[in-house]
């Protein structure tokens, strides 16, 4: 009988850990019970409901759309959103499917899915032209937007963009329940703390990991991350086309980014987008818009006011 107690203890601990994760369903009740502030809304798009922020809708300036990265949703843009709101810009940010407060869908999470989500939102808002700012994986999304509908694009502004990396699409893009279970078991206990590695000076961002822990409560988050990764591919052809269309392109990098390492693709980037304007933000890692806000804000304003 005594031998049963260690096994029982381990079983209880295991169940306790599993119960921490992915227990909230983002269905209609989630949307209806959400407490929105004055800038926040939900809209039902083709693949599901989308959470977004919008302000200064009557501004005469070109609307600016902020697209977040791989896993952290639109709150990653909060400092920039507030700054541009105060400067009188019409600003839109949103949570892409599978992230934050938007629907976790059952299908494949592709660049095309995200791009169409943004385009449908802009159609809902009756926006015909906008400047697009893509952070990290959001760079892939704005590239795909330009690929689908270049007429809607004013400026393309890439911030620490991962869209220029060499990627091979997985042969099998379906996500199994086993893959989800293993991802949660292997990654969820440490994934929030890992977000601090995006910063050059993580000690300045106390609580950033705690905020990410909240995302782990939503059922389907792990599947969304796995599916997104499986559906990545090299975007060289799209970027060549962007260059041929003479769309205004700007790239902004943290000078100490260890997540997207500039030197690994800089030569290819010069070949793909030789006419881009490029900026490096000092004393910042993968999130220069947070880590060196003064310098980043000066750069983004110089672009948007040009």
List the predicted regions and their residue ranges.
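Flexible "cap/lid" loop of the alpha/beta hydrolase fold
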Residues: 144-148, 155-186
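Active-site loop/oxyanion-hole signature of alpha/beta-hydrolase fold enzymes
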Residues: 45-48, 93-133
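Catalytic active-site module of serine/aspartate enzymes centered on a nucleophile-bearing elbow/loop
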Residues: 276-306
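Alpha/beta-hydrolase fold catalytic core
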Residues: 2-62, 86-89, 305-306
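Conserved alpha/beta-hydrolase catalytic His-Asp/Glu region
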Residues: 167-173, 183-244
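Short beta-strand/loop motif that positions the catalytic acidic residue
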Residues: 245, 251-253
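Acidic catalytic loop of the alpha/beta-hydrolase fold
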Residues: 256-260, 286
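Conserved HGGG/HGGXW glycine-rich cap/lid loop of the alpha/beta-hydrolase fold
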Residues: 17, 55-101
